[in-house]
A protein has these predicted regions:
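Sec-dependent N-terminal signal peptides
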Residues: 4-14
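Sec/Tat signal peptide C-region and signal peptidase I cleavage site
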Residues: 15-20
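Zn2+-dependent metallopeptidase catalytic core
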Residues: 23-44
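Catalytic zinc-binding patch centered on the HExxH motif and its immediate surroundings
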Residues: 49-70
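Walker B catalytic acidic pair
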Residues: 93
């Protein structure tokens, strides 16, 4: 019984570490793409993981100055979800940064359409999440 419990615990830890690694890989890849986008749009963007955000937000884009933004992802929330949430969240927040706009209006939607081209590796689940965001705004 003790052995079964030990094996079960190790299996759970292994699965958890693999899932966390997938989240980290998507985050690192997405953060690098965000830097390319920032360069193309002539803005500065810092992408960070944080342990919590106000009002249970999953992510936020904050203005730090003229042409300077910080994107924060609630990593506890993000890791509790599928790793398919990482890329759409980065696209959503980058659209706010490149438009210097905190609303979900046509300007933001147009930015989403432009930004998805930077993420050719998106799978259909991620693309569906982005489409749902756009549909809500339109």
């Amino acid at each position: 019984m003790k052995k079964l419990l030990s094996v079960s615990t190790l299996l759970v830890l292994l699965v958890g570490s693999v899932l966390a690694e997938n989240h980290n890989k998507k985050f690192e890849k997405g953060a690098a793409i965000c830097q390319q986008i920032a360069q193309d749009y002539n803005i500065e963007v810092e992408v960070k993981k944080v342990s919590a955000l106000p009002n249970n937000a999953a992510a936020c884009c904050m203005r730090k100055g003229e042409g300077k933004f910080i994107i924060k992802l609630d990593w506890n929330y993000t890791c509790s979800m599928t790793d398919n949430i990482v890329t759409p969240t980065l696209i959503h927040e980058m659209a706010h940064a490149v438009t210097n706009n905190c609303g979900h209006n046509q300007k933001w939607v147009n930015a989403i359409y432009d930004l998805v081209d930077y993420f050719p590796y998106m799978n259909r689940y991620e693309a569906n999440i982005v489409n749902q965001e756009v549909e809500k705004a339109e």
